[in-house]
Curated annotation (Swiss-Prot):
InterPro entries registered for this protein in UniProt: RraA, RraA/RraA-like, RraA/RraA-like_sf
Cofactor binding, per record: Divalent metal cation.
EC top class, as a word: lyase
Native species: Mycolicibacterium paratuberculosis (strain ATCC BAA-968 / K-10)
Positions that bind substrate: G78, D79, V80, I81, R100
Entry cofactors: a divalent metal cation
UniProt keyword terms in alphabetical order: Lyase, Metal-binding
Protein's UniProt name: Putative 4-hydroxy-4-methyl-2-oxoglutarate aldolase
EC number: 4.1.3.17, 4.1.1.112
Catalytic activity reported: 4-hydroxy-4-methyl-2-oxoglutarate = 2 pyruvate; oxaloacetate + H(+) = pyruvate + CO2
Residues that, per the record, bind a divalent metal cation: D101
Record-stated family: Belongs to the class II aldolase/RraA-like family.
Matching Pfam families: RraA-like
Length: 160
C-alpha cells in the first residue's frame, strides 16, 4: 500500500490535540528525509537476525519500526540491511537504537531514523518479536497504522 507523504506539521494542524506525535528525538540518517507508509514492527535487543528476515520480505512501501530497547551498544542496521530494505520496497526504518555505516546510509534512497550510531555489529540469534505494538516517545506504533516522518518528527495516524 502506497501512502502519500504529508508534512508532519500539517498533520498536527489537521488532527489537533489528539495527534499521535512521537516525543522521542531521532537522528535523520537516511537519504530520504521524508517518508510515510503502513507500520510493521520488530522488537529485538542487540540482535538483528529477525529484523533482517522481515526486511527480506516485500515491504510494499511500509515503514518498519524497530524497538531495540534504546541500546546504542550495537548497531541493528547498516548499509547491507538498509539496501536490502530499499530493494524490497520499504519506505523507511525507525530504529529505537543504533545504526552504522552512516555515510553510506545518507546516500541511499530510503528513510532511516535512529537514536545514534555505533560501528559494533549486533548478534544474530534471531531473538525478538514481530508485529507487536511498540510504544516509543508516548506514541504506540501499531502494525497497520500509518507513520509519517520528516525533519520535524514522526506522526502516527490510524490505518485503513
Amino acid at each position: 500500500m502506497t501512502v502519500s507523504f504529508r508534512p508532519t506539521a500539517d498533520l498536527v494542524d489537521d488532527i489537533g490535540p489528539d495527534v499521535r506525535s512521537c516525543d522521542l528525538q531521532f537522528r535523520q540518517l537516511g537519504g530520504r528525509t521524508e517518508f510515510a507508509g503502513p507500520i510493521s514492527t520488530v522488537r529485538c535487543f542487540q540482535d538483528n537476525a529477525l529484523l533482517k528476515s522481515v526486511l527480506s520480505e516485500p515491504g510494499g512501501g511500509g515503514v518498519l519500526v524497530v524497538d531495540g530497547g534504546g541500546s546504542l551498544h550495537t548497531a541493528l542496521v547498516g548499509d547491507v540491511i538498509a539496501e536490502l530494505a530499499r530493494a524490497n520496497g520499504w519506505a523507511g526504518l525507525i530504529v529505537n537504537g543504533a545504526v552504522r555505516d552512516s555515510a553510506a546510509l545518507r546516500g541511499m534512497d530510503i528513510g532511516v531514523k535512529a537514536l545514534g550510531t555505533n560501528p559494533r555489529k549486533s548478534t544474530k540469534t534471531g531473538a525478538g518479536e514481530r508485529d507487536v505494538d511498540i510504544t516509543l516517545g508516548g506514541v504506540t506504533f501499531t502494525p497497520g497504522d500509518i507513520a509519517y516522518s520528516d525533519d520535524d518528527g514522526i506522526v502516527v495516524a490510524v490505518g485503513d
